[in-house]
């Protein structure tokens, strides 16, 4: 899931055309429980285009929520930028369509730390019932501490796996102020 949040001044302050980054903390920390997500911020109109591509790739590859933040200035602006040439690197890795091994549960971790193998409609042995509630590897609702701990560990492993793929972002301004 990719959520794009174009922020403006608010709430109902008579400032709907003013810029504000008032949703930043809510985007980062505004959830219940241990549900990590990726939060990105676009800095230019061209960056808005590429940020959504990157966000979609992260969301699909790591099966997690990605929030892309922008502000009213970028959200209401128009600016030409060079027509991008399509790149295969924009795409998430393809979902395996071979038969799911017999007995494999929907939340069994695959070789990639913290990631689960997704099935696609029509895939042999790939039909599962999934839940958004706390669950065990078989997707049965489970409130026991062991299942909860395993879910937290799996979500943490996703972030660690993602972190290994990231490049150091550029610094704008005085690097000494960091």
Predicted segments with their positions:
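Flexible glycine/proline-rich, aromatic-decorated loop/lid segments
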Residues: 1-34
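Acidic, glycine-rich active-site loops and adjacent beta-strand->loop/helix elements
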Residues: 5-12, 44-46, 72-75
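Glycine-rich, flexible loop/turn motifs
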Residues: 20-23, 36, 126, 168
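Structured core elements
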Residues: 2-3, 39-41, 67-69, 76
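Active-site/ligand-binding-proximal alpha/beta "capping" segment
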Residues: 35-57
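Active-site-proximal structural scaffolding
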Residues: 4, 17-20, 48-51, 59-62
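Flexible, low-complexity linker and terminal segments
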Residues: 51-178
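Short coil/turn connectors at secondary-structure junctions
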Residues: 1, 21-22, 33-37, 61-65, ...
């Amino acid at each position: 899931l990719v959520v794009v949040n174009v922020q403006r001044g608010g709430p109902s302050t008579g400032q709907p055309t003013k810029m504000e980054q008032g949703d930043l903390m809510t985007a980062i920390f505004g959830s219940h429980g241990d549900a990590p997500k990726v939060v990105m911020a676009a800095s230019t109109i061209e960056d808005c285009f590429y940020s959504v591509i990157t966000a979609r790739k992260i969301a699909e590859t790591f099966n997690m929520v990605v929030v892309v933040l922008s502000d009213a200035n970028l959200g209401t602006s128009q600016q030409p930028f060079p027509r991008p040439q399509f790149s295969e690197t924009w795409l998430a890795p393809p979902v395996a369509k071979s038969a799911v091994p017999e007995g494999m549960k929907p939340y069994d971790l695959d070789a990639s730390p913290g990631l689960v193998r997704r099935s696609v409609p029509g895939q042999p042995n790939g039909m599962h019932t999934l839940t958004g509630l706390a669950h065990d590897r078989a997707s049965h609702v489970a409130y026991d501490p062991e299942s909860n701990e395993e879910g937290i560990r799996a979500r943490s492993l996703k972030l660690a796996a993602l972190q290994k793929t990231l490049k150091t972002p550029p610094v704008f301004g005085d690097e000494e102020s960091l």
